């Protein structure tokens, strides 16, 4: 890679959004997106809103969530914010109830995530519990709440998309809980698909590093720890095994949700969209 690393979250432009013709992409239908205040969640909110679906953007960050709503409106879409703590069942229930008032819930994008880097023997159990709650238990709970809404919709068709990772395929040191929950999300994905009778689909998305705040804020600390430049962290550490030496953007990941939710993916039932620049499947 050339030049200095830009640690700012990329700007999302309408021309970057994948727009698809789809009978379910209309204002009468609703998509719930978690982690919508920034990164992939924000981008997915904007992408689904730009495709004509009403979006309930859920996040604990109220300022970021409201900013996402305004961005969606600038793209000509409709979004509404719901503040939710994904460790609280009653708040998730309230969020789904709010979404149901907007229209027929058809889509759920489980994207919210946090990170903690530590070896197993040093890993704080409180942090384990928090990551497990936000990144695996909450997606299960939300799917449990959303599936009945999809079933009772006019045609009973809908989909749940889960944001996995290359860490749902391979593990790396000092990320034990991230590895665990991402592998678990693939199990949840396949379980939903198995019970969906071909009408309620589920899929996961596995990418390498994406230029989200979660990933970008790791770069300076990793550079300091390793005694290398931020550029070297991205090129040699984050993208060391990737055939493409640049980070994927949030909207590129969001477009995978658009595709996965669309009629073009009607045979994507329990499958995983692995878009990782060759990290998992190739080597030298």
Regions found by a protein language model. Give the residues of each.
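Short C-terminal tail/terminal secondary-structure segment
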Residues: 2-21, 25, 170, 258, ...
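Conserved glycine-rich Rossmann-like NAD(P)H-binding loop of the short-chain dehydrogenase/reductase
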Residues: 53-67
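Substrate-binding pocket helix/loop in short-chain dehydrogenase/reductase
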Residues: 119-120, 124-132, 238
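Active-site loop immediately N-terminal to the catalytic Tyr-X3-Lys motif
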Residues: 121, 170-177, 216, 245, ...
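Active-site helix of classical SDR
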Residues: 143, 181
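Residue(s) in the substrate-gating loop at a strand-loop-helix junction
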Residues: 165
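Short, small/polar-rich loop/turn modules that mediate ligand/substrate recognition or access, typified
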Residues: 197-201, 268-270
């Amino acid at each position: 890679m050339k030049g200095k690393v830009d640690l700012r979250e990329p700007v999302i432009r309408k021309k970057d959004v994948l727009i698809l013709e789809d009978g379910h992409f209309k204002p009468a239908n609703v998509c719930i997106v978690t982690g919508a205040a920034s990164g992939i969640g924000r981008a997915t909110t904007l992408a689904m809103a730009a495709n004509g679906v009403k979006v309930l953007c859920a996040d604990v960050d109220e300022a970021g969530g409201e900013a996402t709503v305004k961005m969606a409106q600038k793209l000509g879409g409709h979004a509404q914010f719901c503040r939710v703590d994904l460790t609280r069942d009653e708040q998730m229930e309230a969020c789904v109830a709010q979404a149901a008032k907007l229209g027929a819930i058809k889509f759920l994008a489980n994207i919210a995530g946090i990170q903690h880097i530590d070896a197993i023997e040093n890993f704080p159990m409180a942090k384990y519990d928090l990551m497990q709650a936000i990144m695996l238990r909450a997606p299960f709970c939300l799917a449990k709440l959303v599936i009945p809404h999809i079933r009772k919709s006019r045609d009973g068709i809908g989909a749940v998309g889960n944001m996995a990772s290359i860490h749902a395929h391979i593990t790396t040191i000092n990320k034990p809980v991230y590895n665990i929950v991402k592998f678990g999300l693939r199990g949840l994905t396949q379980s939903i698909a198995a019970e969906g009778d071909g009408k309620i689909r589920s899929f996961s998305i596995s990418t390498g590093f994406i230029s989200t705040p979660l990933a970008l804020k790791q770069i300076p600390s990793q550079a300091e720890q390793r005694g290398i430049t931020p550029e070297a962290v991205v090129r040699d550490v984050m993208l060391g095994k990737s055939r493409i030496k640049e980070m994927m953007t949030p909207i590129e990941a969001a477009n995978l949700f658009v595709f996965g939710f669309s009629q073009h993916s009607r045979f994507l039932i329990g499958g995983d969209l692995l878009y990782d620049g060759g990290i998992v499947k190739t080597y030298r």
